[in-house]
Amino acid sequence: MAILLFRVDDRLIHGQVVVGWGRPLGVNRIVLVDDQVAASEWEQDLYRMAVTPDIEVEFVTLNGATARLRDWQSDVRRTLVLTGDLETMVALHAADPVTVHRINLGGVHHRAGRRERLPYLYLTDEEMTRLAALEAAGAAVAAQDLPTTPPVTLKGLG
């Protein structure tokens, strides 16, 4: 079944990911790619509490993820790969652009220098440029908070 979704969401694992995306897609594994969380059992325990028992959770570093992308893609488990920031997703795409070919932008919230593109998506001009580079390299990039809402292409984020 492979990797069903590559998602950027700065809240990491939470209800919208587990229920909003996980259930409709039939996800039975979430892979969180985050160096800090991968090194912290305490944080891993917190995120596991947000996931139902039927969903396996893996916490991996960026280096660990780049080494395992093809394995996850060929696995029978229905997998959602989640990063908390755009930089990590860009690095995953650079490591394997064939596997990381569709990128979902979820909750990326306000910080200094970012401006609202959608109610749940704030990006700097530099981040928009990075996303345009991903598209130029062949990745399909779209913002979509839930599968029940229409995706917004990069052009629509202006």
Regions found by a protein language model. Name each.
Residues M1-V51, E56:
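Long, hydrophobic N-terminal alpha-helical segment
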Residues A2-F6, N28-V31, E56-E58, R78-V81, ...:
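Structural motif
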Residues D9-L12, T61, L123:
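A general structural motif
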Residues W21-P24, L46-V51, A95-T99, Y120-L121, ...:
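Short, solvent-exposed amphipathic alpha-helical segments in soluble enzyme
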Residues D34-A38, T61-G64, L86-E87, G106-H110, ...:
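Short, ordered loop/turn segments at secondary-structure junctions
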Residues S40, L46-A50, D54-E58, A67-T83, ...:
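Short basic, glycine-rich beta-strand/loop surfaces that mediate nucleic-acid
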Residues E58-G106:
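Ordered, amphipathic secondary-structure segments that act as subunit-interaction surfaces
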Residues H101-G158:
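Glycine-rich, aromatic-bearing surface loops/beta-hairpins
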